[in-house]
Amino acid sequence: MQLILVRHAQPVRIEQVEGAADPGLAGVGVEQAERVPAALGHHRIARVVSSPQRRALETAGPTAAKLGLEVEVLDGLAEYDRDLPAYIPIEDAKVEFRAEYDRIKAGHLPSVIDEPAFRSRVLDAITDIAVRADHTDTVVAFAHGGVVNILLQDILGLARPLTFPIDYCSITRVLFSRTGRRTAATINENGHVWELLPRNISA
């Protein structure tokens, strides 16, 4: 079984709301999301699943439409920030919230996050995806950088939960054998959105 994890496209910024911030996609994010179906075109995808957060669901839309499949929402794929009242894109946090940015770039979750609970939720959701799949299936999951990293940390036995940079709409592929062995086949494939990434738009 192959699990293809796609990070959401670039969302809008939300400063402060009552309750949890749940941003949709920015204009460039819509364009990024529209690149994903072609990037996945050579895979025979049996199922499309997504985090319940808007930025992931809106990213999943073009791919699901192209495949003629429904998007199945899995609560366990939500990001660690799901209950926070603001969403500050990482490229903005680099300037405005340097201490938290440096913490994340050092490979650690934000200090307010319950890391064991987040890890358990994500890994349980991914285990359920694998259990439900036939061994020949390819499932695409639209999720978040933290979700992708938690899985990679578990597979590779890494010390830190946020080891890899995971770009907007990047593709990470994980293979599950029938014996339960998991292999990270590719990490952060981003050629399909390269010129649309913030660091390249502003270059």
Residues covered by each model-derived region:
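Phosphate-handling substructures
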Residues: 67-124
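Short active-site segment of divalent metal-dependent hydrolases/proteases
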Residues: 11, 147-148
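Active-site signature of alpha/beta-hydrolase-fold catalytic machinery across serine-
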Residues: 62, 150-154
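Acidic, low-complexity terminal tails and accessory targeting/binding regions
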Residues: 69-73, 79-92, 131, 135-137, ...
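Generic beta-sheet signal
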Residues: 3, 137-143
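Short beta-strand scaffold positions
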Residues: 50-51, 120, 142-143
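Generic structural signal for well-ordered alpha-helical scaffold segments
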Residues: 34-41, 119, 123-131, 152
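Active-site-proximal alpha-helix that buttresses catalytic centers in soluble enzyme cores
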Residues: 2-72
